Amino acid sequence: MPKRTDIKSVMVIGSGPIVIGQAAEFDYSGTQACRVLREEGIRVILVNSNPATIMTDPEMADATYIEPISTPILEQIIAKERPDALLPTLGGQTALNAAMALGEAGVLKKYNVELIGASLDAIDRGEDRELFKKVVEEAGAESARSDIAHSLEEVDKIAEKFGYPLVVRPSFTMGGLGSGIAHDEDELHRIAGAGIHYSPTDHVLIEESIEGWKEYELELMRDKKDNVLVVCPIQNVDPVGVHTGDSITVAPVFTLTDREYQKLRDIGIAIIRGVGVDTGGCNIQFAVNPDTGRIIVIEMNPRVSRSSALASKATGFPIAKIATKLALGYTLDEIQNDITQSTPASFEPTIDYVVTKVPRFAFEKFPGADPTLTTSMKSVGEAMALAGNFQESLGKAMRSIDKRHMGFNWDGDKPSEDEVSQLLDAIKVPTEHRYLQIQRALWGGATEEQIFAATKIDPWFIRQFALINETALEVKNAEKLTRKLLKKAKLAGLSDLQIAHLRRLGDEGENTIRELRWSYDLRPVFKTVDTCAAEFDAATPYYYSCYADETELRPRDREAVIILGSGPNRIGQGIEFDYTCVHAVQELGKNYDTIMVNCNPETVSTDYDMSDRLYFEPLTFEDVLEIYEAEKKMGPIKGVIVQLGGQTPLSLAARLKAAGVPILGTTPESIDLAENRELFGEVLKKADMNAPRYGTALSLDEAREAAHAIGYPVLVRPSYVLGGRGMEIVYDDAQLRKYVDRALKEAQADTVVSGRLPSPLLIDKFLQDAVEIDVDALFDGEELYIGGIMEHVEEAGVHSGDAACTLPPSTLSDDQIRRLREGTYAIAKGCGVQGLINVQYAFMANTLYVIEANPRASRTVPFASKATGVALAKAAARIMVGETIQQQRDNGLLLPHGDGGDIHRGQQVAVKESVLPFKRFRTPLGKTVDVLLGPEMRSTGEVMGFDRDFPHAFAKSQLAAYEGGLPTSGNVFISVNDTDKRQLPLFAARLVELGFNIWATEGTASVLRRYGIDSKIVDKISVRMDSDPDDPITTYHAEGSVGKNVVQLIEEGAIDLILNTPNSRGSRSDGYAIRSAAIAADLPQFTTMTEFSAVLMAIEAVRNNDYQIMSIQDHSTQLFELESRD
């Protein structure tokens, strides 16, 4: 059945911003879809609100719209572009829900747009819990006993029928949002209430708990001829009760008999047929009772999912690409397997290695959050590793997480009997540390039976953990490390660093072990991912390392460049850095063999055909050096690029150079010049530039001395971090002591000597009421090219990754822009930058201060590139291999004249807004953690608003970030601190003019009354500064009030918009309860006056709904015309 010829144009909907449960995997799948569609000669119209994606690059589609994924905006684009079909199955839950909304609104019918990949009926049957339950029954399979509830009253009736514990599952949400396991009525009301709220269909499934059962997933595909194949079975190491995104997962499955697996396969095939997915893929989750073998179908996703990306990378089978071809009418037997280039896609993949995925968490960013892992996903990223056996694969995956203390360790004495008892209690509750606690408990003498009783993790896996411990004990106690023992340790997944710790070899121990290993000629070999267990030759070089006998690397002729990726997504280092790596691969591939090293299965950079060679390996010194040494034997290497993947590869630069690896672009010495506070101070002094007064400290006494010399408030942070990790605004000595005590505790015990830290704390004067600016630039040693000047909407103090920003800047004068340009040139020249640099500045009372400089790609590079139409990372890659900025102007990569710092009359305005994951993180009693922003980054993703002026662009950014966007009428609650009350009357008067009603606490209402502005008084709430987030709220009744506090009004749906500026001393004040309630209700809320000023302009601008919709291709053309004109 050949491709359909009636489809000439297709709209693809992306997944929007990176959020927990929906991350970079949809950029990967969407990019594959766009490439397939264009190869087939189909016009592609792409809509996505996330600028930090490869799929929104202009060459990926014929018309690319970086716009909010809302029904009115999508309808405008459909009306303009008139696509023949809509493909919604590659953009996660966002795209699926958007397609359903377009169908229900009659938009698809109105414009005669066909849904391909999955029908509305199939989406409904797969996503709606009640309909799916019927499909399962018709397939002859079993669901957990369950019932549907639309209200808490119905929830209570079901609880009476089934008893506790109960599982709550909402329909049409991703990452288990709104789901959970309830053990009593309070938990049930909290979880089910959130589930009903977050489900677009306002109902939840309440089902019997099957906690402790084994969990499996099947990834299936089906075509029009009813050919069905299972791409990959995946096993969760955690039993049912932990969301699959938060569990360690493995492929192939280890704990099913062949008969059980065939039964799962038969059920899966019956369900994909019953749901009606006939031109694409789906993911089905199963639970198996370990005692009886009873099989329960948990749920399905009738689309490409997070597990699809994992299965694709695990097997080499490109699910998204094939799903797109199936949607166009091809059948599986007509599609070629790209990896073998000799077998059809109808051959089920077979693997002869073990794949392990380990999640990465960020609980440290959300103090007070409940660390318990449940059915609602909480991890922010993941790493994957491949190896010859499970132990080796697990060891590689755990070190790929790139987080201190995340690998097994055997430091110090064995745990005592009391400690083992405590560990056995701790592992009953799943947390991110559970596997380390299991390993420590086994190390201390706990039996495998005790571990199983506490965790219900399958005994096969527990046995593997015990075997790793046994090997570690051998290594620790051996008189001599023989070649045989060293190889056994490597097969057990132990790194050189872990072995060095076991042998107590000190700081140089890792190098000592490597030299010993090399003296034995004990090195990893590299095997190929080929989809067919080596039955056919692989044409694509996709490699993993293992300690086996024969390497499968092939010689090459061209000079190679190795690019180090960014590893697992995390807060502070996300998809933006994968974007810059992919651009470097695309550009350098024209002249060099590109070799990509990364361990993140979600990303475009780890697609099998993106680079000339892909190594799915941990980004550690040991693993990267082994790749370099192996590739050196295969052909010439120009060098390694470390400045595009964020802090992870950057931290390897100095050691790699010391080991003889050539580093391209900015040298490790120059990196240190910018990162080291004292050395950077000298650069600024020579350039006659201001920095906030600062000091450094290695102890509490030094910190106190520095803070007193500078004057409170101060900004305190560790050296060499990304995403503002550990950064805090400190107002007095008591707060400073707490900060230093915590830093000493978090530092590795063996590096702390008598209260002194291993690396200095940086202490800066905090600039209050300053305007913060980010500048991204290119430098080739002589010429500077400004990529973009981005003005923050919030004042200084909010981390640049969380702040909204605008490009071009909206309030800077020509003179201020000139000073920024001159300052950036002086810093880039002084630091010896060769490639990208990001400098953060602040203007306070028209004095320019340099906050920091980063001689690498920054997270704003994709945004600046999309806003200016210039691929900065591509130009940077060419500069790193020795080309000049003038050469990039000549070849068209950069503007022929001027740069991104120039402002042109009539230029479109771009606004970047951050997206925060607060609804995922709750305290143990269910309240959301505080949303107050500060110097430590907490956002997971970003959106971009693009329009003719700042108010319209800002309004679009809010529409993309908040479901429904900004209200244009209704009730506004206002509560501001004393400092902000001076600005309040102007804001309040404008709100009244716009038709809003103002609700305020008594103090704020009193200020407004003096200016003749009416407001309704609400009762004041009080939370002690030192209270626990879960402490009850005290209400103080005010005279003339409406008789309710604001939290009650938010919960009743009476409030539409919130302005709540906090007191300076932190989040445990009254505002916390307000902000928490607003997050639970999905209300737009703003915590700074500067941002609320922008909100007012935006509301005024969009009252007529007159957004300008323009593709970025048209925008780039307009920009080049304006540049030529000016």
Curated annotation (Swiss-Prot):
Q: Which residues form the ATP-grasp domain?
A: 133-328, 681-881
Family classification: Belongs to the CarB family.
CC terms in the record's Gene Ontology section? cytoplasm
What note about domains is in the entry?
Answer: The large subunit is composed of 2 ATP-grasp domains that are involved in binding the 2 ATP molecules needed for carbamoyl phosphate synthesis. The N-terminal ATP-grasp domain (referred to as the carboxyphosphate synthetic component) catalyzes the ATP-dependent phosphorylation of hydrogencarbonate to carboxyphosphate and the subsequent nucleophilic attack by ammonia to form a carbamate intermediate.
Q: Name one GO molecular function term.
A: ATP binding
Provide the residue span(s) of the region labelled Oligomerization domain. 403-551
**What PROSITE patterns does its record include?**
ATP_GRASP (PS50975), CPSASE_1 (PS00866), CPSASE_2 (PS00867), MGS (PS51855)
BP-aspect Gene Ontology terms: 'de novo' UMP biosynthetic process; glutamine metabolic process; L-arginine biosynthetic process
Report the source organism: Bifidobacterium adolescentis (strain ATCC 15703 / DSM 20083 / NCTC 11814 / E194a)
Q: Name what cofactor the protein needs.
A: Mg(2+); Mn(2+)
**Family matches, as CDD domains:** MGS_CPS_II (cd01424)
Which parts of the sequence bind ATP 2?
R717, K765, L767, E772, G797, V798, H799, S800, Q840, E852
- Protein name, per record: Carbamoyl phosphate synthase large chain
Q: Which domain of life is it from?
A: Bacteria
Which residues are noted in the entry as Mg(2+) 1-binding?
Q285, E299
Where along the chain is Mg(2+) 2 bound?
E299, N301
- Its top-level enzyme class, in one word, is ligase
Q: Which residues form the signal peptide?
A: none
Q: Which segments carry the region annotation Carboxyphosphate synthetic domain?
A: 1-402
Residues covered by region (Carbamoyl phosphate synthetic domain): 552-962
Residues that hold Mn(2+) 3 according to the record: Q840, E852
Residues reported to bind Mn(2+) 4: E852, N854
What does the subunit comment say? Composed of two chains; the small (or glutamine) chain promotes the hydrolysis of glutamine to ammonia, which is used by the large (or ammonia) chain to synthesize carbamoyl phosphate. Tetramer of heterodimers (alpha,beta)4.
Free-text comment on the cofactor? Binds 4 Mg(2+) or Mn(2+) ions per subunit.
Q: What reaction does this catalyse?
A: hydrogencarbonate + L-glutamine + 2 ATP + H2O = carbamoyl phosphate + L-glutamate + 2 ADP + phosphate + 2 H(+)
Matching entries from PANTHER family are given as: CARBAMOYL-PHOSPHATE SYNTHASE [AMMONIA], MITOCHONDRIAL, CARBAMOYLTRANSFERASE FAMILY MEMBER
The entry marks the following residues as binding Mg(2+) 4, namely: E852, N854
